[in-house]
Curated annotation (Swiss-Prot):
The active site is at K95. 1-deoxy-D-xylulose 5-phosphate binds at G156, A182, G183, N204, T205. Keywords: Cytoplasm, Schiff base, Thiamine biosynthesis, Transferase. Its main location: cytoplasm. HAMAP family: ThiG. Pfam families: ThiG. This is Thiazole synthase. Its EC number is 2.8.1.10. It is found in: Cytoplasm. InterPro entries: Aldolase_TIM (IPR013785), Thiazole_synthase_ThiG (IPR033983), ThiG (IPR008867).
C-alpha cells in the first residue's frame, strides 16, 4: 500500500494521458495498467466544455486525476495553472512542472522550488517533477512537498534510468515517497526503479506509443508488481568475485 498525503494507492504505477491515438484507447490502457491516478495537462483541457474529449471520459472512469502545470515556464505561471486546476477540477493535488526549454523539457530547479513553497503555503498537495538532484529533492521535501518526482531521463526519451546513481541517493535519504518520472521506456526500466526502492513510477510515452498500448500497459503493471515484490523480498548483495552456490564437500576425493 502506497500512501501520499491524504490518499492511499494499491497500484504503484501512475500513468499519463498524452500521445494516445484516441480517448477510448487511453481509457482501456489505463484500466489494464491498474493505475489509480493519471496525470492531466491543464493546457490540453477546454474547461468551458463539460464534455471535453479528454476530461469527461477520465472523470467518468473514476481514476484519480493529477493535474499538472506542463507548459509553465516560471513559478508564477505554475501557481496560476495550479489555482485554475483547483477551481475547475475541485482538487488540491498538483503535479508541479516547470520546463522553460521546449527542446529538452528539463525542469527548472530554481523556479520549481519557488513555486513549491508558494503552493504548499496555499494548501496544495505538491508533487514536483524535478531533476535527479539529491540536494534539490531534500529541499523540496523540506518545503512541504508530499512526494518528489525525479527524472530517470528526459521526458519521452525512453532511455531508462540514466540517473540511477543519483536516484539511489534520493531514495536513500527521502522521508517522502519517491516517484520516478520521465524517461521510463520499457517495463524492465519500471521494474528496476521499484527494485531500487522507488515508491512508484509514472509512465506515459512508453505505453501510449507502443504498437499495442493495452498490452504494454499490462506489461508495465506486471513489471511494477514484480519490482516491488523483489525489493520487499530483499535482493542479494552484488559482489565482484564468484561465489559457489554448491560449496565443495570433498566427495570427489572420497570416491578416489
Amino acid at each position: 500500500m502506497l500512501r501520499i498525503a491524504d490518499k492511499t494507492f494499491q497500484s504503484r504505477l501512475f500513468t499519463g494521458t498524452g500521445k494516445f491515438a484516441s480517448s477510448s484507447l487511453m481509457l482501456e490502457a489505463i484500466r489494464e495498467s491498474g493505475s489509480e491516478m493519471a496525470t492531466l495537462a491543464m493546457k490540453r483541457v477546454d474547461l468551458l466544455r463539460r464534455d471535453d474529449a479528454l476530461l469527461a471520459p477520465l472523470q467518468a472512469s473514476g481514476v484519480a486525476l493529477l493535474p499538472n502545470t506542463s507548459g509553465a515556464k516560471t513559478a508564477e505561471e505554475a501557481v496560476f495553472a495550479a489555482q485554475l486546476a483547483r477551481e475547475a477540477l475541485g482538487t488540491h493535488w498538483i503535479k508541479l512542472e516547470i520546463h522553460p526549454d521546449a527542446r529538452w523539457l528539463l525542469p527548472d530547479p530554481i523556479e520549481t522550488l519557488r513555486a513549491a513553497e508558494k503552493l504548499v503555503a496555499q494548501g496544495f498537495v505538491v508533487l514536483p517533477y524535478c531533476g535527479a538532484d539529491p540536494v534539490l529533492c531534500k529541499r523540496l521535501e523540506e518545503a512541504g512537498c508530499a512526494a518528489v518526482m525525479p527524472l530517470g531521463a528526459p521526458i519521452g526519451s525512453n532511455q531508462g534510468l540514466q540517473t540511477r546513481a543519483l536516484l539511489e541517493i534520493i531514495i536513500a535519504q527521502a522521508s517522502v515517497p519517491v516517484v520516478v518520472d520521465a524517461g521510463i521506456g520499457a517495463p524492465s526500466h519500471a521494474a528496476e526503479a521499484l527494485e531500487m526502492g522507488a515508491d512508484a513510477v509514472l509512465v506515459n510515452t512508453a505505453i501510449a506509443v507502443a504498437r499495442d498500448p493495452v498490452a504494454m500497459a499490462r506489461a508495465f503493471r506486471q513489471a511494477v508488481e514484480a519490482g516491488r515484490t523483489g525489493f520487499e523480498a530483499g535482493l542479494g548483495a552484488r559482489v565482484f568475485q564468484a561465489q559457489a552456490t554448491s560449496p565443495l564437500t570433498g566427495f570427489l576425493e572420497a570416491q578416489a
